Amino acid sequence: MMMTAIGLMSGTSLDGVDVALIKTDGRRVGALGPSGYRPYTETERSLLRQALAEAVQLTARDARPGVLAEAERAVTIAHAEAVAAFVAQNRLSPGSVDIVGFHGQTVLHRPAEKLTVQIGDAKALAKAIRIPVVCDFRAADVAAGGQGAPLVPVYHRALAQSLGRDGPIGVINVGGVSNVTYIDGTDTLIACDTGPGNALLDDFMFRTLGKPFDCEGRLASQGVIDQAWLTEALQHPFFAKPTPKSLDRNDFANLTLRDWSPADGAATLTAFTARAIAAVQPLLPKPPQSWIVTGGGARNLTLMRMLREALAPASVESADALGWSADAMEAQAFGFLATRGLKGLPLSYPATTGVAFPMTGGLLARP
C-alpha cells in the first residue's frame, strides 16, 4: 500500500532543514512530491557548531550535557517550523500525511565504538506537527556492528529501477561527507562514504571569508590546485580501506591546510573531494558507466567539471537532469526509509554498512 511520507534531513553541512514529500510503499517510488527548505539562522548554526565540538566527549548516545540540550531543542523547533511551513505552503492537512521521517542532526558518528548520536526530540516533534514520526535510523545498524552509514543507497536503487540503463550506475551524494552507491541492475547494492564532501570547503570558506559555502564553485574556478598537498592528502589511510566504510564529518579536520589564498584553497579542497570520489572506483566490481550527482555538491559547477575529468570516460550528470532532485534527495530518502522502517524492511545491508545481515531500523513516536 502506498503511503504519503514527509522526509526531513539536516546534513553535516549545517545549512538547514530539507523537507520533501514522497508517495511510496517502501519498495517502489510512486511519486515525488514538492520539496522545501528551512535555512538555519546564523545563531542556530553557531549553536550547532558548539554542539559538534562538545559532542566529541560523548560516550552515551542519549546524553545531552551542556550546549547539546539547547542544540537539541533548537533542532526540534527548526524541524517543526519547517514542517508547518511546508504543510501550509502546499495546502496539506496533517491527516493527509501518514508518516514523517526525521533524521535529526548528527553530532557524533563513531561506529567502531558502536556510537552514533543524532540530536532532535522525535516525541516533541510528533506532538508539535500532529503526525507520527520515525526517528533514530542509524542506531540499530551501529549496535549490530554496522557503520550506520550510508543509508540512502536503498532509495537510490528504487529510483534507478526506473532508468532502464545498461551497465553499472554510480550515485554520488555530496553533502558534508560524500558517499557513493553502486547499482548494477541485479541485487548487488554496494555503498560507502568516499571522503570529504562540502565540509572541508565550507569550513575553509567560513574561516577565510565568513561565507557559508563557495556558490556554484565560482571561487574555486579562479584558483590553482596545490597538487603536492592533494597528493599527500590522498594518502590518508581511509582511502585504501575496503568497502563498506563510513566517516564522521570531522575525520579529515586534522589535515594541515596550507596558507593558501581563498581561491587556491577553494580549488584545492574542491579537487580533493572529486579525487576522493574517483578513488573509490578500484574498490567496486566494475567502473560505473554513468554517474549521477546529488546533494549540494551538484550545484557546484567547478566540482562537477572536476568529477567529469576524474571519472572519464564515464558520463557525469546532475540528478536534476533526470527529473530527480539533487537538493531534496536525502529528505525524500528519509521519507522512503521511514516507510520501510514501519514495515520492517531492511534499511541497510552487509555491502552498504558492513552489518552482518540486512537490518531494519527506526523508532516510532506518536503525537
From Swiss-Prot:
Keywords carried by this UniProt record: ATP-binding, Carbohydrate metabolism, Kinase, Nucleotide-binding, Transferase
Organism: Rhodopseudomonas palustris (strain ATCC BAA-98 / CGA009)
Pfam families: AnmK
Function: Catalyzes the specific phosphorylation of 1,6-anhydro-N-acetylmuramic acid (anhMurNAc) with the simultaneous cleavage of the 1,6-anhydro ring, generating MurNAc-6-P. Is required for the utilization of anhMurNAc either imported from the medium or derived from its own cell wall murein, and thus plays a role in cell wall recycling.
Catalytic class of the enzyme: transferase
Protein family: Belongs to the anhydro-N-acetylmuramic acid kinase family.
NCBIfam families assigned: PRK09585.1-5
Catalytic activity: 1,6-anhydro-N-acetyl-beta-muramate + ATP + H2O = N-acetyl-D-muramate 6-phosphate + ADP + H(+)
Single Gene Ontology MF annotation: phosphotransferase activity, alcohol group as acceptor
Residues given in the record as ATP binding sites: 11-18
Name of this chain's protein: Anhydro-N-acetylmuramic acid kinase
Pathway as given in its UniProt record: Amino-sugar metabolism; 1,6-anhydro-N-acetylmuramate degradation; Cell wall biogenesis; peptidoglycan recycling
UniProt record, GO biological process: 1,6-anhydro-N-acetyl-beta-muramic acid catabolic process; amino sugar metabolic process; peptidoglycan turnover
Catalytic activity, EC: 2.7.1.170
Residues forming coiled coils: none
